[in-house]
């Protein structure tokens, strides 16, 4: 059963938990002009993998991160534009971006209204020392 709740891991976005178990959580994000689903897999403390399935033109899908977090983004299909400071980076199929977050980002844009990709997030303050 899906439950709607304000989830503090998503900046200013109403997230509906579609499924949750010991291995992953599936969210549907609100506040969009279409459908945005994120599947989140915690790997280790401070490290997670997020699959993005987007059929919308914009969404505040940025998960709240501590300053200094490292994100590795890969676009499998579609296109995404992420604001970053005074600039913006665009990913097309096959593109990869490595970003160090200093603050929460503005909403992502999807010029084609379609995006499938993956993000690996690493919070060095919480990640195991062996990594």
Report residues per predicted region.
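A short, N-terminal "cap"/entry segment at the start of jelly-roll beta-barrel domains
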Residues: 1-42
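N-terminal regulatory/effector-sensing and dimerization cores
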Residues: 27-131
């Amino acid at each position: 059963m899906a439950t709607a709740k304000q989830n503090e891991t998503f900046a200013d976005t109403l997230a509906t938990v579609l499924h949750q178990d010991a291995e992953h959580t599936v969210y549907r994000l609100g506040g969009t002009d279409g459908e945005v689903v994120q599947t989140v897999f915690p790997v280790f403390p401070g490290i997670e993998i997020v699959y993005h399935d987007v059929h919308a033109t914009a969404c505040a899908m940025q998960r709240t991160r501590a300053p200094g977090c490292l994100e590795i983004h890969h676009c499998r299909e579609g296109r995404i534009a992420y604001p970053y400071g005074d600039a913006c980076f665009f990913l097309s199929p096959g593109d990869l971006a490595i970003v160090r977050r200093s603050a929460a980002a503005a909403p992502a844009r999807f010029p084609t209204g379609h995006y499938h990709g993956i993000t690996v997030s690493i919070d060095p303050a919480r990640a195991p020392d062996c990594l």
